[in-house]
C-alpha cells in the first residue's frame, strides 16, 4: 500500500556483515503528529480521520543465522506483549528463532486485520442508520467486505502452513513469504476501508516484526481517539495501484455489475410504487428525494423518485378572454337583471355574498352571449304562424258552409213538387263557390275596425228580422180587412194618419182598364197576367243592376219565380173569395204589387246576408286567436317571453317589478 502522509519517518540501515547471515537493523522513529484517512473500496460514502499521539520507539534486534533450529523444537523466549500491543525483548542480545518470529508477525497481522474489520463494520452500521436510501448498497459492500475478510483469513492460514513447512529454506524464501504476507494485509485493509501507509525499505524478518508492532500500536491508538472535523478524501485508484494483483479491467467489470444491480433495484421499486398509486387526480408538487447509489472515482448516479401517496400537480389552464360586443338591447336586459340581483343580494347572509357575487358575474356574462332575434327573424316566425292559422280557418269554413247548407235545405218548406229541384241547385252552387277567407295583416286591423264590422253585422240581422215580421203582418192584414170591407184602415199606417190622394192612381188604373166587360174569371186572369209581366220586368232590371253576382242572382230569380207562383196561387184563391172587391178597388192591386217587390228584394238580400254572417264568424275567430296570441306576449303572462324587445321596454317603463313571480 501507499500513503500520502506516512506516520513515521523511518531510517533503516541494513548491513550484511557476513555471508553466513549476521544482520543488524537499527530504527530511529521521530514522533510527528499525522492524520490518516480510511476509505471504503467501492462505496466510499464515508471518510473517517484518526489523529495519532506522539510516540517514541527504539528497538535493536540482532539475529544470528549461524545456528538453525528444527521446527519441532519448542523453545520459549522471554517475549512479552503488553495491553497496548508494544513488545520489548528482555534479553536483547539473545536471538530468537525464525519460526517464532514469523508466527509472531502472522499473529500480529491477523490481529490488525481483525481490528480493521471491526472498525469497518462499526462504520458501516452507522452509515446504515443515517442513510436509509443506501441500505442496499451498504449491505452489498458489507457482504463484499466480509467475503474479502474471509479470503484474507484463508490466505493467512495458508501462509502459516507455508511458513511452517518452509523454515529450512534460505533467507530469500523468508523475505518472499514476508512480502506476500504484507501484500495480503495491504489488500485486505484496502478492501475493508482502513489503509495504513508504510514504506518497506528493508525486507528482513526483523523489519516485519517491527512493522507489525507499529501497526498494532497504531490500531489501538485509532480506536481510542476521536475523529477531527476536517477530512481528507483519498482517491480510489491510489489505494489500489500498489496492489500487485491490481487490474483495471476487473474494477471496470465490478463497477458495471454494481450499476446494473442498482438500476434493477430502482426499476423494481418504481414499479411497486406505481402499482400502489391508483386513482390520483388532484396533486401537489412532488418532492424529489435523491438517493446516492454509487460514488466512485469515475461517476456518481442519482435517481429521483416521487414520494408515495402524493398527488401530481393539476395542469393550470390559463383563462381565455373572449371579446363580447353587446348591443343596446342586450345592455338594457343586463340592467334589468343587475337590479334584480342586487335586490336578491340584500337578503343573502354575509358569509355567502362573495360566492353569490361571483355566480352573478358568470350568469351575466352568459346572458350577454345569448343573441336577441332581429325584426326580420321575428317577422318570419309570425308569418309561419299566420299561415298555419289560415289553413286551420279554411278547414273550419268548409265545415261550416256544409253545415249551413244542410240546415237550410231541411228548414225550407216544400209546397210544390218543383221546389226540391231548386234547392238542390242552390246547395251545389254554395259548395262550388266557397267563401274565401279574409287575409289581412295584423298591424292594419285595429280594434275600431273590428267594432265597426260587428255593428254592421248586428244591424243587418235586425233589419232582416224586421222585414220578415212586416211581411207576415201585411199578409194577415190583407186577409182580414179585404174580406170585411175595411180597405181604408190599411192606408192608415202609424206614420201616416190621413188618407192619401188617390186621383193619380185612379187615372192610371182607368187607362189600364179595358172598356169591354168580361166575366169575373176573365178579369182575374188578365190581372194575373199583368202582374206576372211586371214581375218579369222587375227581375230583368235587377239582373242588369247586379252583373257581378251572377250565380246568386240566378238562384234568387228562381226563388222569386217560385215565390211569385205561390203568391199568384194564393191571390187566385183570394180573388175567387173576394172577386168583386179587388175588381172595384185598384188600391189593393197596387199594394199587392209593392209587397211583391219587397219580397223580391228580401230574397236578393238574404244570400248576401248569409255570406256576411259567415265572414263575420270567420273574422271573430280570427280576432279571438290573435287576441290570445297578444295576451301571451303581454305583461300578464311574463313566463311566456316570445317577444323580448317589447318585454324589455315595458319592464323598463314599469319601475315596480314583482320578484316573487320570477
Swiss-Prot record:
Q: Where is this region: Disordered?
A: 1-94, 107-237, 288-328, 406-440, 506-580
- Composition bias, Polar residues: 162-176, 203-212
Task: Point out the signal peptide segment.
Answer: none
Q: Locate the compositionally biased regions of type Basic residues.
A: 226-235
Question: Where do Basic and acidic residues bias regions lie?
Answer: 77-87
Out of the domains of life, which is the source?
Eukaryota
> Where are stretches of biased composition, namely Low complexity?
25-49, 109-161, 183-196, 213-224, 288-308, 413-434, 515-526, 535-575
Q: Would you tell me the protein name for this molecule?
A: Putative uncharacterized protein DDB_G0292292
Amino acid at each position: 500500500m501507499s500513503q500520502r502522509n506516512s506516520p513515521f519517518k523511518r531510517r533503516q540501515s541494513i548491513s550484511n556483515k557476513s555471508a553466513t547471515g549476521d544482520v543488524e537493523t537499527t530504527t530511529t522513529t521521530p514522533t510527528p503528529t499525522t492524520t490518516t484517512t480510511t476509505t471504503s473500496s467501492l462505496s466510499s460514502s464515508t471518510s473517517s480521520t484518526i489523529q495519532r499521539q506522539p510516540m517514541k520507539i527504539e528497538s535493536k534486534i540482532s539475529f544470528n543465522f549461524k545456528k538453525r533450529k528444527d521446527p519441532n523444537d519448542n523453545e520459549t523466549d522471554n517475549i512479552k506483549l503488553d495491553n497496548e500491543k508494544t513488545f520489548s525483548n528482555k534479553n536483547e542480545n539473545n536471538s530468537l528463532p525464525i519460526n517464532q518470529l514469523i508466527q509472531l508477525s502472522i499473529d500480529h497481522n491477523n490481529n490488525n486485520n481483525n481490528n480493521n474489520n471491526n472498525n469497518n463494520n462499526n462504520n458501516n452500521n452507522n452509515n446504515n442508520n443515517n442513510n436509509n436510501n443506501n441500505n442496499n448498497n451498504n449491505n452489498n459492500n458489507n457482504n463484499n467486505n466480509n467475503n474479502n475478510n474471509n479470503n484474507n483469513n484463508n490466505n493467512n492460514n495458508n501462509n502459516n502452513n507455508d511458513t511452517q513447512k518452509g523454515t529450512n529454506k534460505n533467507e530469500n524464501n523468508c523475505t518472499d513469504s514476508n512480502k506476500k504476507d504484507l501484500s495480503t494485509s495491504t489488500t485486505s485493509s484496502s478492501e475493508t476501508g482502513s489503509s495504513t501507509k508504510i514504506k518497506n525499505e528493508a525486507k528482513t524478518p526483523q523489519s516485519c516484526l517491527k512493522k507489525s508492532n507499529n501497526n498494532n500500536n497504531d490500531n489501538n491508538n485509532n480506536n481510542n481517539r476521536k475523529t477531527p472535523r476536517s477530512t481528507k478524501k483519498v482517491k480510489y485508484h491510489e489505494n489500489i495501484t500498489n496492489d500487485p494483483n491490481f487490474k483495471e479491467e476487473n474494477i471496470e467489470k465490478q463497477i458495471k455489475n454494481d450499476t446494473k444491480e442498482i438500476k434493477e433495484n430502482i426499476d423494481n421499486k418504481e414499479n411497486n410504487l406505481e402499482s400502489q398509486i391508483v386513482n390520483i387526480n388532484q396533486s401537489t408538487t412532488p418532492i424529489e428525494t435523491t438517493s446516492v447509489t454509487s460514488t466512485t472515482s469515475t461517476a456518481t448516479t442519482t435517481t429521483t423518485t416521487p414520494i408515495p401517496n402524493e398527488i401530481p400537480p393539476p395542469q393550470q389552464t390559463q383563462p381565455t378572454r373572449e371579446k363580447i360586443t353587446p348591443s343596446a338591447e342586450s345592455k338594457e336586459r343586463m340592467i334589468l337583471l343587475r337590479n334584480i340581483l342586487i335586490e336578491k343580494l340584500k337578503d343573502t347572509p354575509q358569509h355567502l355574498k362573495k360566492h353569490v357575487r361571483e355566480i352573478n358575474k358568470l350568469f351575466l356574462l352568459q346572458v350577454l352571449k345569448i343573441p336577441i332575434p332581429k325584426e326580420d327573424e321575428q317577422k318570419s316566425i309570425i308569418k309561419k304562424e299566420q299561415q298555419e292559422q289560415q289553413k286551420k280557418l279554411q278547414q273550419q269554413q268548409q265545415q261550416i258552409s256544409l253545415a249551413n247548407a244542410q240546415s237550410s235545405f231541411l228548414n225550407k218548406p216544400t209546397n210544390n213538387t218543383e221546389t226540391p229541384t231548386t234547392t238542390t241547385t242552390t246547395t251545389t252552387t254554395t259548395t262550388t263557390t266557397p267563401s274565401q277567407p279574409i287575409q289581412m295583416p295584423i298591424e292594419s286591423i285595429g280594434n275600431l275596425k273590428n267594432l265597426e264590422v260587428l255593428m254592421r253585422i248586428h244591424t243587418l240581422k235586425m233589419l232582416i228580422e224586421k222585414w220578415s215580421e212586416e211581411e207576415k203582418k201585411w199578409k194577415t192584414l190583407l186577409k182580414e180587412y179585404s174580406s170585411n170591407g175595411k180597405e181604408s184602415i190599411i192606408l192608415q199606417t202609424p206614420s201616416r194618419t190621413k188618407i192619401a190622394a188617390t186621383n193619380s192612381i185612379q187615372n192610371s188604373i182607368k187607362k189600364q182598364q179595358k172598356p169591354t166587360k168580361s166575366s169575373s174569371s176573365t178579369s182575374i186572369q188578365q190581372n194575373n197576367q199583368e202582374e206576372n209581366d211586371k214581375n218579369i220586368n222587375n227581375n230583368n232590371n235587377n239582373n242588369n243592376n247586379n252583373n257581378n253576382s251572377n250565380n246568386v242572382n240566378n238562384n234568387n230569380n228562381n226563388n222569386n219565380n217560385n215565390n211569385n207562383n205561390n203568391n199568384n196561387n194564393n191571390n187566385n184563391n183570394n180573388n175567387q173569395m173576394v172577386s168583386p172587391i179587388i175588381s172595384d178597388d185598384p188600391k189593393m192591386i197596387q199594394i199587392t204589387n209593392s209587397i211583391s217587390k219587397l219580397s223580391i228584394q228580401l230574397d236578393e238580400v238574404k244570400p248576401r246576408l248569409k255570406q256576411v254572417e259567415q265572414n263575420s264568424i270567420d273574422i271573430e275567430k280570427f280576432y279571438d286567436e290573435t287576441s290570445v296570441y297578444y295576451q301571451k306576449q303581454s305583461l300578464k303572462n311574463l313566463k311566456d317571453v316570445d317577444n323580448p324587445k317589447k318585454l324589455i321596454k315595458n319592464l323598463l317603463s314599469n319601475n315596480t317589478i314583482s320578484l316573487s313571480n320570477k
